[in-house]
RNA sequence: GGGGCUGUAGCUCAGCCGGAUAGAGCGACGGUUUCCUAAACCGUAGGUCGUGGGUUCGAGUCCCGCCAGCCCCGCCA
């Protein structure tokens, strides 16, 4: 309906110009043209759209809002293009103008979407690269629940942007550099030197244990700390022994990460922190040239504007430590320059999106400010932190295992699939259905992972997220199983003889449930546009849930296969477009669908 | 101390550029199956939108104060 909304907006503006020529001209001169405030109708009984602009004009025009609305409507009715599109507008309440699109126009919109891969979503015209930076686990650690949201949300946002036609660079900014490596390598040199020059000498689980030990020593032992720092400097200086050890550790971790990504069907290009190593000195030079750099306590800093620390002094972003080493702020700045920079040493991006937890908001705000002041953000480019809240257990505290450890992502996914399998088996039992082992594994795997993804995505990402297997796997409510079931129902119609591919001429609808479904289906383009702009996947989830509800109502109350000969093709067309929209929408959430479950 | 986020029904949460009587789901209670998968559908009950001011024709939404919870605050990422 975006095209129709756009057309209506223009028609409304023209009508306002004709109704109030002097005020319209004056408003345009003040570069605040009269706004019809066109919005989707807040309730179905108000039609398809509402224009609230008359209310705002009451004061400047010194007229009653309903009188203003009447004048605008009179002008609209004089416009043949408008009367061709809409029924007679209704003025309601204090002065709302309610607009209802002609049924035949809605039916024509549905027709146009049948068989359209894009489902009415326009492709972007100017396609500049978009960077989505997400997931970002640390080398030598296992992926855990802390990586869940970034990975799932980032992937979904990338999919939506790709669907709109943007060239998307999915970057995995893995933690493969810095102090942590100094600690690990120093520790391994002492306790497991094999791991540093032989591939797979220890497995990843051991490596994680070594890492934990190293971290403990680092925190407790000053001498170890110093050696570790020296090790980092060696690594950053390109010492061959350190580099080889580092390479082996990275390979090993990378393979483990890939297993998770394969399982979740997530595509990512690894470009870790180390990638930006050669560009770090230029960051310092650049900041020096921009006269932003200040030496403080031996460290190179940029002091932030508008952000005060404990003592009321401006807060610094440290870009070079007193020992000469660089840190994450330096890397992030180098990454910003690279991503906005021109090829070959740059990505030429116009939008860069970071999907990381909300706890890093201060860090990014600081880094973005420095980049801005250094002039590294091109005119019109967008640099956005997409924050999300913590994953909490049902007790409202940070999610932990019963033993109090961090939950491994692998275990979390396993449990979701296991629970889905248990549910499925007991259901099959109850219904006295018999299915192959292959069917059970496939359905349980799909439903389990879909549930994990959907539960996360369906929540506004800003707030903390309460993780609950029971809720996400529930068969009713705003859950993946409920949505998947709607798709299964349509597949059932196709199996039972409904030819969804049949092409019909004129679509015709008679039942309110059909019209409700038509109107819901036509909202898809606006929802995608909104997610692209706001980067909130939960908006897409809400839409798909509502679409499923409207479809289930239709399915329950209106016969499809047993419909009259005249109604049948149109109803099959609705089923087809619903299935396509649900599959496409779920696909943008990274969730595959099933024909039977 | 400074900064950020959050506070909406018993629970988990939506709420779009400020717009009409604040919405879902779960849970509770009641109903629906000779018919395309009842994993569904229909209905009932449930609200001082943390709180006090302000702006506005109109505030859950914007501004200011306060309260509560979570997170961050110099050489980890």
Swiss-Prot record:
BP GO terms, sorted: arginyl-tRNA aminoacylation
Region (Disordered): 23-43
Compositional bias ranges of the Low complexity kind: 23-32
Subcellular location per the Swiss-Prot or TrEMBL entry: Cytoplasm
GO terms of molecular function: arginine-tRNA ligase activity; ATP binding
EC number: 6.1.1.19
Catalytic activity: tRNA(Arg) + L-arginine + ATP = L-arginyl-tRNA(Arg) + AMP + diphosphate
Main location per the UniProt record: cytoplasm
Gene3D superfamilies found in the cross-reference section: Arginyl tRNA synthetase N-terminal domain (3.30.1360.70), HUPs (3.40.50.620), Isoleucyl-tRNA Synthetase, Domain 1 (1.10.730.10)
Name of the top EC class for this enzyme: ligase
Sequence motif: 'HIGH' region, positions: 137-147
Key words, A-Z: Aminoacyl-tRNA synthetase, ATP-binding, Cytoplasm, Ligase, Nucleotide-binding, Protein biosynthesis
NCBIfam families: argS (TIGR00456)
Name this polypeptide is given: Arginine--tRNA ligase
